[in-house]
C-alpha cells in the first residue's frame, strides 16, 4: 500500500514538474516573442523615419536595399500645416504602440531604447500646438542656408545614387513653393518673421545665386563626379550637363522665387522683439528649449544653472588674475595655437586623448572649406554625420581657410572631430545600437558633448596652463551669457535695451553687444543646446565624482556617456545611478 502511494506521489510530482516546466517554457517563449516584436517595431520606426525624404535616406544609409528600403519618389519632404498635423497624428499612434509593450519583459538594451524613444515622441508631440511658430527659414540654420552643403555632400555610392540625386535636385522648386505657402500662412496668422531677419535671408539667397554659371552646386558637382572612378568620360560629361541644366533652370529659379516671396511679405511681421511677445510665444519657447536641450529642468532651473555657471566662470577668471599678474597680458597677446593645420590638429588630439577617453576604430576624415558664397551665413565649422552603415568616411567643413581663422581652429577641431562629434559618432555607431536611435535628434547631448570636450581640449593645446584655464573660463562665461540672454529675450520678454545692458555687463563693446542681440533674436534657442548640454554633462560629472569619490575614473565616466549615446539627460542620469552602484562595489 505504501509502495503504491509512493508511486502515485512520484507520478504526481512528475506531472507537476512537467506542468511548471511548460509554464516556464511558455513564459520564456512569450517574452522572446514580445522582444522580437519590439525589435520589429523599432525597425519599422527607423524605416519610416529615413523614408520621409531622399536626403534623410542618403545621409542615414549607404545601402538602403539591405534594409528592404526603396524610394519610389525623389522628395525633400513636406513643409505644410497638413503634413505637420499628419506627422503628429502618426507620432501619437507610435507612442500608443510603444506604451502597449510590457516594459519588464524587454531586455536591458531594449529598455534603454524604450525610455529614449518614449521621451523623444512625447517631446515631439509637445510642439504640436504651435505649428505656425515653427520656422524652416533662418539666417544660420534655415533650410535655405543648409541645403547647398547637404546637396553637395549627397553620397554617391554607385550610379543609382547619382541618378537619384539628379531626380531629387529639380524638386527643390516645388519644395520652396511649399515653404513660401507656409510663410504666407504664417503671415496671415501674424507670425511672420521680422523685416530684419527676412532681409538677411534675402541677402543670403542673393549671394548664393550671384554667379549662376559658377554656382557652388555646379562647380562642386563637376569636381566630385570627375573623381568618380566607375564612370566613363561620356557618362561624366552627361551627368555634368544634366546637373548644370537643373541648377540653372530649377535651383537658382527656386532661390529667386524665395527672394521675391520674402520681399512681398516684408512689413507683414507683427513683432520685432522676442517670442515672448507672440500670443503663445513663451509657452512655445519653453517646449522648444526642452526639445533643443534634452534637459528635464524647467526654465527657472535652467536660468539658475546658467547664472551659477557665469558666476563660477568669473570667479575662476578673478582667481587666475590674482594668482598670475601677467595673465591679462598673456590673453591680450594670444594670437595663435601652436598647431594650425586642421589635419595635424586632429592627429595631435587622437594621441592626446588616449589617457582620458576610450579608444575607437580608425576612420577617415576629410577637411573641406565652406564656399565663399555661403561663408557669411554658416557656422564656423560643421561635422556631417555619415550613414550608419558607412561611418568610416567623415567630412568636416571649416568656414574660412585664411591664416586668422586657422590660427584659432584647435578647439574647433576638437569640437567637430576628436574627441567631439566625429569621435562620439564613430564610437556610438561601432556599438551597433538599434538603428532607430541614429535618427532621434538629441541636440543637447550632441552639442553638449562636443562643447564639453572642446573646453576639455584646452589642456591639450600646448599653451601656458594658466592661459588655457583663462581661455576656457572666458569661453564658458560667453557661451552661458549668450544662452542666458536668449532666455531673457524670448522667455522673459527683455527688450533690446534690457538685453544689451545685460550683455554689456560682461562685454563693453556696444557694437558687439548689438550683434549678439540680433543673432539671438533671429534664431531662438540657437545657443541653448551648447550651453545647457555642456552644463548638464558637467553636472553629471560632478555628481559622479562626489558619489564615487576615489573610485571615480574620468575615462570610465566618458565611456559611460559614450556607451549610453544620445539621449535626454534625465534618462542618462537614471542610468548613471545604476552605473555608479556597479562602480562603487
Task: Please annotate each region the language model reported.
Residues 28-585:
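N-terminal maturation segment of proteins
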Residues 14, 26-29:
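N-terminal leader/targeting segments and the immediately adjacent pre-domain N-terminus
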Residues 21-24:
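C-terminal motif of bacterial Sec signal peptides marking the signal peptidase cleavage site
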